[in-house]
Amino acid sequence: MEKKQNKRAKGEFYELMAQRYLEQHQLTFIARNFQSKTGELDLIMRDQDSFVFVEVKYRNTSNFGSAQEMVTWQKQRKLQRTALFWLMKNKLSVEHTSFRFDVVAIHAQGKEINWIKNAIVEG
């Protein structure tokens, strides 16, 4: 149980780091850890007229691949489904609402942050 709590605390720490990084780049915070049956969205931000669904990935080393490589095809599908659910839940039209999927990859205890806009292409 302690290992799971420690992992969750670490996840929250890096999500907050990513949120602050994006806020420094003029994005507005909307929500963190939105959960549904389809999955979880780490961060929901707003970039001018667009909603930004952000997946935060952290890796201490790149021995097993970079943080952004950890966003698998299956994870991308879950993110897309969860984002569409969030839009519908908030009475926003999928066809008439601007949104994108970004990844914030954090390496080396936060010394390196890589923000990848449009990392996941809808479709």
UniProtKB/Swiss-Prot annotation:
InterPro entries: Restrct_endonuc-II-like, tRNA_endonuc-like_dom_sf, UPF0102_YraN-like. Gene3D superfamilies: 3.40.1350.10. GO terms for molecular function: nucleic acid binding. Belongs to the UPF0102 family. HAMAP family: UPF0102. This is UPF0102 protein VF_2212. It comes from Aliivibrio fischeri (strain ATCC 700601 / ES114).
